[in-house]
Amino acid sequence: MAKYLGGIEDSNIEIIGVSQHFFSSGFDIQYYNYQLDTLAVQKLDIAKSLVKYEEVSAEIHSSPNRSATGALVGYLAGGPVWGIIGAALSGNPAYEKHVILCELENGWRFAVELDKNEYRAWKEAMDKRR
């Protein structure tokens, strides 16, 4: 699930998060609207109401602890040679994070963080808008 980073300041609503459509590349903002009598989750399709967006960062994070853990497990299992093998095999898997600023027709401005797959779906949804 995409991570809502904040930005919408409206006392009548509470943002729950940003979700990706199950069978398509669209995204919804999920929120409670306190002006309504029910506390049902409301959804707003971002692609249909987007005025503008801007990608502000794209980062690749890696975990150095993974390699150290692999080395320790290998060392404990078979000594120094296995420690080196464990460090080499465990590697440092990297993961991407993209932060995007959005502005909707209703005036809402917010930031959302997407992983690699969500970002691909985001780009696909934005390409369909054109």
List where the protein language model places each region.
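A composition-biased, non-transmembrane "mature-region" signal
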Residues: 1-130
